[in-house]
């Protein structure tokens, strides 16, 4: 069975490319079906898709593809075709990790070692969601199930035995730091949050600690926006929830805009921001776009009075705290190295299961045939002792026929290998079953 992890992330591709190969949640299940059919021509391949702001990754287990370039090329072609992105444009940014490298990568991702925010925990929840979705789509089997269960166990071990999450600067905290560099005080600013998901909740919590002048939440579902606004108002803040369609009329009111929705298209265009800046009499506005695909048209960054930051821009701020956790990284890598070896041992033992089953099947067929022959001998009145002798002799001859034939007809290095191997296979053990 071949394992393969293929994908792009924040270290290999800019957000402008990552957003083009992101999978909306509602598209993942049908995409898994299409991927498995593409790779094997049938639904024999196991697969899972992890798609976040910082990465799009495909994990596969298949016995159809050959290891190496074939698996990479097949998966690359499917990913490029699915998203209508030229394969030649995508390929330089992709990593393809086979076997133990794929296992190590999964362990590192879940443990937060491959994240923009070193040691962050959000990725573990996102990976669990991806595995749950793959399971619901019927795309998981023995190998990926085992891989991901061990992945979650390793992540728990790493976080429990190291300080990988200590001194962590989250994306939300990084957004606040950037705001503090632009504005003398966040407490005098009006802040708009677009969306009401987990990332927006985290950002809102961090900004709320700076007691801004006002916090407004814009969301497609106004009830969800109201819920977040009410939570923030309990901290003594002035809050409000508005409908997303009212954004154009209100955008000019805000000094800081933080957006993270699941929209596949930008929801804030260049024209809307130009009008907002004009109504603000060119007072600066800071915009933080944490969405992938992006919520704000990239052209907005060209405006003189707008400070637009994407998830990649926040990465530099996040990395400032990463150096403080290098000792924890070394400890985490040591744990992962050990657990990768354990998993690969399990994988290797799985490869002999079909051989063992075939041996057992052949042995059982021989046994049944000889027992039936012995019964016929007993039925016609043959001496039981002679029947037992005949039975045991026939079993011995037939069980040893294969090894004996191989020893007599194999030459060279293969014969030498058999001469070393066969005695051990038939050596009597005091612990063997009786």
UniProtKB/Swiss-Prot annotation:
Keywords: NADP, Oxidoreductase, Porphyrin biosynthesis. It holds the Pfam family GlutR_N. It catalyses: (S)-4-amino-5-oxopentanoate + tRNA(Glu) + NADP(+) = L-glutamyl-tRNA(Glu) + NADPH + H(+). Pathway: Porphyrin-containing compound metabolism; protoporphyrin-IX biosynthesis; 5-aminolevulinate from L-glutamyl-tRNA(Glu): step 1/2. One of its GO terms (molecular function) is glutamyl-tRNA reductase activity. The record marks 105 as: Important for activity. InterPro entries: 4pyrrol_synth_GluRdtase, 4pyrrol_synth_GluRdtase_dimer, 4pyrrol_synth_GluRdtase_N, GluRdtase_CS, GluRdtase_dimer_dom_sf, GluRdtase_N_sf, NAD(P)-bd_dom_sf, Shikm_DH/Glu-tRNA_Rdtase. Substrate binds at residues 52-55, 115, 120-122, 126. Belongs to the glutamyl-tRNA reductase family. HAMAP family: Glu_tRNA_reductase (MF_00087). NCBIfam families: hemA (TIGR01035). This is Glutamyl-tRNA reductase. It comes from Cupriavidus metallidurans (strain ATCC 43123 / DSM 2839 / NBRC 102507 / CH34). The lineage of its organism: Bacteria, Pseudomonadati, Pseudomonadota, Betaproteobacteria, Burkholderiales. The gene is hemA.
